[in-house]
Amino acid sequence: MNIKIICVGKLKEKYFKQGIAEYAKRMSKFAKFQIVEVPDEKAPESLSNAEMENVKAKEGQRILEKIKDRDYVYALAILGKERSSEEFAAEIDKLTTYGHSDIDFVIGGSLGLSPEVLKRADTQISFGRFTLPHQLMRLVLSEQVYRAFMINVGSPYHK
């Protein structure tokens, strides 16, 4: 199985990198795990709606270039479906049972994801209505993917 987190922007914070590296190491017995960063589009502080859509479109194109045709894609979106850890684990288990060996998770930049990326996604997932920095979301998502594997093997980690 291959798990890929595709995200906009570079992760600079050492403490986030260390946390993600720890979960990547733990996941290595279950899946190949990788983070793919695409450049964020430089933009001024205040943007018109048209400029915002243009930024999302450019970032979206960069994201789509990293997704293969057969990949199963989760888009992280505030309006996506919330799942419990158990539901998420069951979903991952079901995907692998039905032959989806490449699963991508897409985290947008500060303006969110383009309509094209949302359209390409097989499903949208939400971690709640909170707004979180996308750097932190990488760590939270890494932990939840690891937790899903642990639930699926019956590990006490989830308790």
Swiss-Prot record:
Which GO cellular component does the record give, naming just one? cytoplasm
User: Which Cys-Cys disulfides exist here?
Assistant: none
- Where the protein is mainly located, per its record? cytoplasm
Location(s) in or outside the cell? Cytoplasm
Q: Which Gene3D superfamilies match?
A: 3.40.1280.10
The record's keywords, sorted A to Z, are: Cytoplasm, Methyltransferase, rRNA processing, S-adenosyl-L-methionine, Transferase
Q: What is its EC number?
A: 2.1.1.177
Spell out the HAMAP family in the cross-references: 23SrRNA_methyltr_H (MF_00658)
Instruction: Give the UniProt family note.
Output: Belongs to the RNA methyltransferase RlmH family.
Q: What is this protein called?
A: Ribosomal RNA large subunit methyltransferase H
Which organism does this record belong to?
Lactiplantibacillus plantarum (strain ATCC BAA-793 / NCIMB 8826 / WCFS1)
Gene name per UniProt: rlmH
